[in-house]
A protein has these predicted regions:
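N-terminal short leaders/motifs
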Residues: 1-16, 40-50, 101-114
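Alpha-helical membrane-targeting segments
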Residues: 2-38, 124-150
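Short, structured beta-strand-loop surface elements
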Residues: 75-138, 142, 149-151
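A hydrophobic membrane-anchoring alpha-helix module
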Residues: 147, 152-164
Length: 164
């Protein structure tokens, strides 16, 4: 059964510096060292209109379309998630691949299925994400589904045909 515990406060100081390190690695053209599991998402700020960047874990892929799935660990209040809802055109860099695409928030059912598929593949990362987000789980497939459905929205980014 999913339960909510007090979430950790937003990262500041040296923790923020560590959390933002992958973005800096991409800026130094060292992003491929992170592999394909961490991507750099460039999106447009909803109020400033300026480019914003965040490094996120690729939680899944759709080989048929080339789409990637990303999880908004801090829910729909995450700045990047709110920005892509306003302007869905994004740029993604994953490994050496650089492409433009369109972001689409997945439905709660799709998010639930994505979380239930992700958690068994990366159990330690999933448990760490739950702790950071202030959620607990019994580890069952149904509980992971419920977490994705109720708390962690996922996003699908489909490459533009001309950049594949």
């Amino acid at each position: 059964m999913t339960a909510r515990t007090p979430a950790q406060p937003p990262t500041t100081g040296w923790r923020r510096m560590i959390a933002r390190a992958p973005v800096q690695l991409y800026r130094w053209h060292l992003g491929p060292l992170l592999g394909r599991r961490i991507c750099l998402l460039t999106h447009t700020g909803r109020t400033s209109g300026l480019p914003r960047q965040t490094a996120l874990e690729v939680t899944g892929t759709d080989p048929a379309t080339g789409a990637i799935h990303l999880a908004s660990g801090f829910g729909p209040a995450s700045q990047w998630y709110r920005n892509i809802q306003n302007t869905p055109k994004v740029t993604v860099q994953s490994g050496r691949r650089h492409w433009t695409g369109t972001a689409r928030p997945m439905t709660p059912d799709e998010s639930g299925r994505a979380m239930a598929a992700y958690a068994p593949l990366h159990p330690r990362t999933a448990r760490t994400l739950m702790r950071i987000c202030g959620l607990t789980t019994d580890g069952s497939t149904q509980d992971w589904y419920r977490i994705g459905h109720d708390h962690i929205p996922f996003v699908e980014i489909t490459p533009d045909p001309r950049t594949q």
